[in-house]
C-alpha cells in the first residue's frame, strides 16, 4: 500500500453488493405483479413505516444490518428514525468503537439529548449530527482544522485522516505531536488539544469513512422501504439472490 501511495496509484475496492440486485429484482417484481413503477432514488427518506420496522428489529435482508446482532441492538435501543442514525450505526459496529463504548454513548445521547456534552463549544458543529459522539474520519479531520481546537490546514488534516484510516501507530504519533505544536502556536488551551490528541490516538483504532457509511445506510433504507411496503416482492427477491437467507430469521 505504501509503495502504491508513493507512486501515486489510486486504489479501488471493487466489491459485489448483492443487495443492489435484490432491490433491482424486487422493483421488477413490483412492476410486473402490481403495475407499480418505483423510482428507488426518489422515495421519501423519512418513511415512518420503514423506521418502525427497523426499530422493531426486523432487519433481515437489510444491507449491513442482517448479520451481526450488534447493529440490530443499536438500532432498536436508539430508536433509529433518521438516515443519519443508520449511517452512525454502520460506523459504530467496529471493534474499536465497541471496545470504547461509543455505541452505548451514542444510544444514551440519542435517547436523552440533554446528556450530550462537548469538550468545547467549537466542537458542536462537527459532532451535532452524532450527538457528540465521534463516528467518522471526516469529523476528526474537521475538528483538526478548527483553529480553536488544533488549526491544521487542509493538507495536514487529510494526512491525519489517512494515517488513522490506515491505523499506522507511528504516523499517528507523529501527527499527534504536530497537532500539539500547532495548537500551542494558536494559543489553544492545553486541555482542549490534549482531548483532541487522545481522541486521535483512540480513533485510529476504529476510524470509519462517513461517505462509505452513508452509502451503506441508503442501500439498507431502500431495501427496508421495499420490505415494509412490498414484503412479498422483497423477500422473494432476497431468497433468489441470497438463498442462504432462507429460514435465517423467522421474525424477518
For each predicted feature, which ranges?
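Noncatalytic, beta-rich nucleic-acid-contacting surfaces in large DNA/RNA-processing enzymes
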Residues: 1-252
